[in-house]
């Protein structure tokens, strides 16, 4: 089994692969205060319930792949792999890790590991040109060229951040449930806020993707040839309202981690 771990700013997602198939997954809160020992106990509690794994941490795991946007958590996970997984090969996606995707940025080291991993998965599963829209703490748009290169992207505030800002900065507004309203024209303050978030973000996605697709296609190219893939925990909120999303792959980042691990596997032989 291959254990993949995607550490985001808000949530950490763990996925278990048997070959190419993801057979189990877990989502926990990301807490920078957790120590390596606390993470190990939490992971053992989750994975110890799986019938294909043993009761000891590391039983049944032949490899580990990790990407993280929170440096302190990455440090602790590195310690987890060293102390609790012994000789199990581990790939941590960071500058210098072999991904197979050229990064055409002014400073490749500043690109988030999760964004690179998403590009790896998109290029492998769908080919290029493609745009990955990841609905997380931030909403990110990442562009993959027809040659499979990572060429850049867009970062905007995420859905939950925007809703929290409304509740904090609006004197007569409050925190509300993140849900699709009955109509665009809200009949209550709650519905009006929900409408602003859901349809506002759908419009943002459609507008940004249209502009990115035109740039990716280039002179004489067809922007409609650009494949648009949605991922991230909040993607379902916008999926039914956006007119540009072609595919939804909730496990895109975990799949990308599997691919990066496989591309680095020969060095473990």
Question: What residue ranges belong to the model's regions?
Answer:
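Phosphate/pyrophosphate-binding loops at sites that engage ATP/ADP/AMP, CoA/4′-phosphopantetheine
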Residues: 43-63, 208-225
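Short glycine-rich, Thr/Ser-proximal phosphate-binding strand/loop in the N-terminal lobe
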Residues: 2-45, 56-59, 148-175, 180
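Short amphipathic alpha-helical segments
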Residues: 16-18, 77-80, 144-146, 241-243
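ATP-binding/phosphotransfer module of carbohydrate and carboxylate kinases, centering on a glycine-rich
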Residues: 1-4, 34, 162-269
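Short, acidic/turn-prone active-site loops that include or flank metal/cofactor-
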Residues: 28-34, 95-96, 117, 155-161, ...
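Short glycine-aspartate micro-motif
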Residues: 2-6, 63-65, 130-134, 229
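Phosphate-binding/catalytic loop of phosphoryl-transfer enzymes
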Residues: 79, 87-91, 96-169, 198-211, ...
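Phosphate-bearing ligand-interacting subdomains
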Residues: 47-55, 61-82, 86
